Amino acid sequence: MSHQVIGLHIGSLGSVVGRFKDRVVDVVLSDSSNRQVPTVVSYNDRERNFGDLALQTNKSNFKRTVVYPNRWLGIQKNWPFFEEESKYSNVKPVFDQTGKIGFNINYKGKEDFYSVESLMGLYFSKIKNNWTREGIDTDDIVVSIPDYFTAYERKAMLEAIDISGIKCSALINESSAISLSYGLLRLGQFTDDKDRIVGFVDMGQAKTTIFFGTFNKKEMKVISVNNERFCGAREFDYLIAKHVSNVFEQKYGCDPMSAPKIKIRLMDYIGKIRKTLTVNKETSLNIDSLMDGEDLTYNLTREEFEKIIKPVTDKFRALCEKSVKNLLEKCKIKLEDVHSIEMVGCAVRTPIIQEIIKDIFKKEVCKTLLPDECISRGCTLFAAMNSPYFSVRNFEFHHYNPYTIEVEYPYVKKDGTTIIKRDVLLKQGDNFPKGKDYTFEKSMLVKNNFNVKFYYNKNEIEWLENDLLNAFNINIPGKTEEKSSVKFTFYVDLNCLPSTKTAELTEKYTEEVPVKVVDTEKKEEKKEEKKEEKKEEKKEEKKEEEKKEEIKMKKVDKERVTKLDIKQVDCLFGTAGGILQRLIQKEREQSKEDDLFKKITHRKNSIENYIYSTREKIDSKFKDYILPEEKEKLPKLMDTLYEWLYSEDENIYNLDSLNTKSKDMYTVGDPIYSRYQNWQLLEENINLLEKAILEITEKINNEKKNDKTTILNKDDFDKLDKLIADALKKGKETKEAFDKGDRKKQPPVDQKDIKEYKDNLYINSENVFKDAQKRVDEEKRKKEEEEKKKKEEEEKKKKEEKKEDKKEEEKKEDVEMKDATKEEEKKDTSNAMDVE
């Protein structure tokens, strides 16, 4: 099987799994055959669900169903949008003792705290089945994240992926994924000398991102990004729901938004109705018995809809204006230089949104991208680019760093005072991954522990109270050489998380080493020796010379490089290592429990279907095939088993108990099914045998009628007639046995034997025709060879006759020439005699 990679877009409304196979990007379908999997997880008394199954039970199981779990990743209690996100949650978010956000959920009769990372770990674990079911086993997996994600949220996403057991090669900003999806498949449209500048508006279920990218044949770059966390389709739905609820409350005195189950029902309905306003100017809301038995009926025009959602559209307009301003001020690019504006996301289809885009950007919107799938496609392409198994066209791609990252370290000045210095490691908008090297001489280093810290720029992200991202302690040896230095590599990785990658101590020192010094005077004397001296004398001379060699010490400059230990400060944010391992183990155990419960449910459903099906057949299809004692015993066994399946006995969820309890029923019932099926198959195969006899007989008769063109001879017809005669006899005997057989016993003839006989009849009859055809072909071949040989012999004879005729002509010509010569000689002799 060829290698494949996976690109996973985790959206607020749903997720899409893309794969790259045979140089084609396509979508992996869910187990419900949908292209998108709802981002929802739920728990019940027996199992955990996600996606479509979790969404289906949202109304009835809302206290244990978490929608938009990815929106809670990494959120801290003091963040300004905590309360805003809470109004979209069915379950109240809480914080544990370590400050981790999560939800108290009752699972299997026990209420427990589940962190958002563990909930997303469940989601990843379940969605992984979508591609493993297709036989895809790969570590080349890329997951998308919103561009505004801080290090807190990025770290939380990575932990959720770790909990699920997925091996993720990288996180990718959604702007990068969209740019790849747009640019990589359009490289042929770009030029080398001029960049194409394209704007993208991504308005989804919960947030909006507007960004610009530049494209040419060699490079793609995201140059400007602006985000709004709360600006999407669900804000539209919430405002409409609030408006309709106010009208309903004024009329009936009850507020639908105050009851969670009714609120969910209303929001779901409005979400469906809202989409109709993209093509219609008016729609009706009709919900039977919404609350306290009262029906909801409301006519909503597009004009009123746009008026109600004005707070959201105002935010969107402000974001568009900010994007244009940043493009001009920071990138020095005017709107007229922008090639086009592409739309992405589920909410950009809203007419008022498209009008605002046209008004601000002065361009018609383009719809060349798949709004719901382009991010997953970009993730998949990025996974292929990073995989060693695929060769992707050579070009550079630049991501966009959302917040400036700074590094802080201690520094000893020349006067001996220690100061804390902070440098910019990665500016906002810079590409990553990226590293910087810092080298400190011994005099500049703080003794023993060297503390390095990474921060966000406070001016860019004012609402983040704790802007510390990471911290490391490097233990520098107290005793080092005088001439020594330490080189640090500070690095921002592909996930946009900073770290201290390496720390190397370089020591320069002088060391005395032994050096051999040879008596050069003796060597000169040896050179002047006469050649006539014997070899033995030379050897003795050499030994004396070695004795005179002296060992002296010489100073040599050397360098020693030592890698220093880098210790990360434990759990500045994120989950501590030990707790994370427990969550990973817990997810594995619960996944096994889910798999076992699926097997139990499947087995339980299989038993129920067996009972329902058998009850219907006992007095109908099985009437002639069931023994009296079986007819008496089997219903009792089924009734007892059925009552047990719907009892409160916990053993109904035990696979061994299900198998044990149902054993007696299958022991009595399976033989009945076996008899019935064998008799039915025997009848079917008898009919097929009769059909085969008729087909072959008709074929033989046609050949007999066409006696001038048939390839069959008398022996062939005799063979076929015998096959048909034997088959008729076999069919007659089997039919008689079938008609006389006792249906309450197994058939007297095995239906497999009749099937095999029928197949052999076809094969043997075909072999007669094939053999006849071979014989005819062989006779034809021999005849052609004889004719060819005869023709060759005739041609050879003609050639020989021509050769003989030619020889005769040549011989005749020679005789005539000789006769002519003799006549000439006679004339010459006669003339000579006359002269004399």
Language model regions located:
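Oxyanion-binding/catalytic loops of NTP- or PPi-dependent enzymes
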Residues: 1-84, 92-95, 108-116, 122, ...
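Short, acidic/hydrophobic/Gly-rich beta-strand patch recurrent on exposed beta strands
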Residues: 104
